[in-house]
Regions:
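Long, contiguous binding/interaction regions
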Residues: 1-96
Length: 96
């Protein structure tokens, strides 16, 4: 089954939420729908991002998983952008 990544650019946190709560929540949301392979925090162009790698049978399902994660994460933090990539050999190709 193909591997995908959702990269969620994180903005302001909801009052009372600590920064270390964002990544576990993003991974939990993805895990509600599919198998989580890995999770990581990255700084991309100065913006903190929660990155969750997961399995999905198609691009359409991967996009739905990413949308679910972004919508659910809005209760924890502002989601500035969402990007979905698919593993193609040794490269990650943009899906959404």
């Amino acid at each position: 089954m193909p591997s995908y990544r959702v990269t969620l650019a994180v903005g302001a946190l909801v009052p009372g939420v600590t920064p270390d709560a964002v990544l576990p929540e993003a991974a939990r949301l993805v895990a509600e729908l599919t198998v989580v392979e890995a999770r990581d925090v990255r700084l991309l162009r100065g913006v903190p991002c929660a990155v969750v790698r997961f399995e999905a049978p198609s691009d359409e399902i991967a996009e739905a998983v990413a949308a679910h994660a972004a919508d659910g994460l809005a209760d924890t933090a502002e989601v500035r952008s969402v990007a979905v990539t698919r593993r193609d050999g040794s490269r990650w190709s943009s899906v959404a």
